[in-house]
Amino acid sequence: MVTDNKTADASFESLLRIFTVPEAPDSTLGIIEKELSQNLNQFLREHIVAEEKPLTEIEKDFTDSSMPESPTYVSEHTEHLLDTLVSQSVHTSAPSFIGHMTSALPYFLMPLSKIMIALNQNLVKIETSKAFTPLERQVLGMLHRLIFGQKDSFYQHWMHSADHSLGAFCSGGTIANITALWVARNRLLKPEGDFEGIAKQGLFAALMHYKCNGLAIFVSERGHYSLKKAADVLGIGQDGVIAVKTDNNNRVCLDDLELKIAQAKAKNIKPLAIVGVAGTTETGSIDPLRELANVAQREGCHFHVDAAWGGATLMSNTYRHLLDGIDLADSVTIDAHKQLYVPMGAGMVIFKDPELMSSIQHHAEYILRKGSKDLGRHTLEGSRSGMAMLLYSCFNVISRPGYELLINQSIEKAHYFADLIQQQDDFELITEPELCLLTYRYVPSNVKAALAIATDEQKIEIYEHLDNLTKYIQKTQRETGKSFVSRTRLTPEAYQHQPTIVFRVVLANPLTTKEILQNVLIEQREIASSSEISLPLLNQIVGNILH
C-alpha cells in the first residue's frame, strides 16, 4: 500500500515500469486479482453496493473535466475505482438480477480475457492478428453450420476463402443488423449499365437509376430500435422502417405485412428487406420465419433474421424447432454476449451465401489489399479485439450439449415461473414464454373482480392506477437491491390493447433458482402493500364498483 507522504512521478523510468513490471501480489490490484480468481461472486457481492444511489449523486464523483497533470499510483487509483465505480456498478451476474439480457459468465473467461488483452491483437488485418484471423473465420463457420447446415465440402471451400466471408464479428447486434442491411442495400442497388452502383455513386443516383422513390424495411412493431438506426445510417431514413402489426402472441401479422408491402409499392417504394425477429426484446416472441421467407422470395428482397437473443436456441435439439425457417434467411444476427455467455461486445452477422459480402468489400493499399484474407475488407468496424477467442473457448469448453442444457433449463424455468404466476390470486401473466422471457403484473384479486364488471370508463381509470402501482413496485424493488425485474409497455388484448406497463423478466442466468423466483413475487407483494398512493386509490375505485 502506498503511504500518504509518497507521490507518483511522471519520469520515463516510472512509465517503463508500468509497461513492464506487474503489480506486487500484496498490492491493492494484486489482492483484487487474487480475490477475483478465487471467488468472483463474493468479490462482486462485497464491492457492489446493493442500495440505490441517485445518479445525480454518482455524477459528483465524475465532474472534473481537466486532464490529470500528475500521475497516481496504481494501488491508489484502484482504491478510487473500487470506491466510486465498482461500488456503484450493477451486479448483472446476480441470480436475482432477472430484468435484462445479462447473466453470470463462466469463470474460465476471466483468465482467458487477460490473455486476449495481453496479446492485444487487431482483427482488421492478418499482420496484426495472424492465427486470430483463421480462428475467427472458423467460429463464423461453426455458427453458419449451426444455422444453415451445409455439408463439410461447403466449409472446406468457403470458410478460409480470401475473397469471401461467411459473416462478420461486430461489437453487438446493432452493428450486425446495420451490416446485414448494408449488404442488402448494395445488392439491390448494384451496378447496372452506366450506373456504377450505390457504393460508388450514392443513394440519390441509385434511386434515379432504378426509378423508385425510396426503399422500405418491413419488420414487426416489436422490432429492435437498431433497425431505425440502420435505416438512418444507410440513407434510407427512419420512415423507411415500416412497422407491421403483431398478433395477440406478439408475432408479426402476415396479412398486415402484405398490406404494408402493397402500400409501399403503390408509392413506388422498393422493398429492401423483410426482417423476422427470433426473440423480441420485450416478450421473447418469434416471428413465423418460414412464411416471412416465402414473402421475401416472392418480392425479390433480402430476408434478414434478427436472432440476437433467440439464435442460441439453435444449440438445443429440443427447442431449435422454434426457429423453423431461419435456414431460409439471407442473413442472421446473433449476439454472443447474450445466450452464448461471453462478455459484452460480441455480436455476429452470418450470411448464407459467401458471395454476399463482396457487395461491401473495401480495399486500402496500406492495410486491406486485394486478395488478402484480412477480415477488415468485409467489416463495418476497422480495429477490433479478438473476442472470437472467447466464443471459440466457450464452444469447446461448454460444447453444444452443454449449451443445450443451459437453453433448456432457461426455457423450462420460464415455464415454471409462468405457472407460478398463474397460481397466484394477485398476479397476472401477460405474455406466455416462448423462450426464457415473459411479462406479468401485480393485479389484486379484488381488482380482477372489479374489472370483470366495470364499464369501459372505469376500466381505463383502473388501468391508469395499475400502471402507477406497477411502476412503484418495480422502482422500489430496484432501489431495495434484493432483486431486480425490468418493466416495459405492451398493448395486450386483455387490456383492450391499451398501452399497459408490465414487469419483464429474463431467465438466462443458470444460477437463478426457483426459490429466488418465489421470493421475487413475495417481495413484490410486500412492496405493493406498502403503496400509500396507487393501492389506496385502486381500492377506493374497486370498492365503489363492487358495492
Swiss-Prot record:
Coiled coil start-end: none
Highest rank taxon of the organism: Bacteria
Effect of a null allele: Deletion mutant cannot grow in minimal medium.
Keyword annotations from UniProtKB, A to Z: Decarboxylase, Lyase, Pantothenate biosynthesis, Pyridoxal phosphate
GO BP field: pantothenate biosynthetic process
EC number from the UniProt entry: 4.1.1.11
GO cellular component: cytoplasm
Residue positions, PTM N6-(pyridoxal phosphate)lysine: 338
One GO MF term attached to the UniProt entry: aspartate 1-decarboxylase activity
Chemical reaction(s) catalysed: L-aspartate + H(+) = beta-alanine + CO2
Cofactor(s) listed in the protein's UniProt record: pyridoxal 5'-phosphate
Cross-referenced InterPro entries: Asp_decarboxylase_pyridox, PyrdxlP-dep_de-COase, PyrdxlP-dep_Trfase, PyrdxlP-dep_Trfase_major, PyrdxlP-dep_Trfase_small
Matching Gene3D superfamilies: Aspartate Aminotransferase, domain 1 (3.90.1150.10), Type I PLP-dependent aspartate aminotransferase-like (Major domain) (3.40.640.10)
Associated pathway: Cofactor biosynthesis; (R)-pantothenate biosynthesis; beta-alanine from L-aspartate: step 1/1
Similarity field: Belongs to the group II decarboxylase family.
Function: Catalyzes the pyridoxal-dependent decarboxylation of aspartate to produce beta-alanine. Has weak activity with glutamate.
Protein's recorded name: Aspartate 1-decarboxylase
Biological source species: Aliivibrio fischeri (strain ATCC 700601 / ES114) (Vibrio fischeri)
Encoding gene, per UniProt annotation: panP
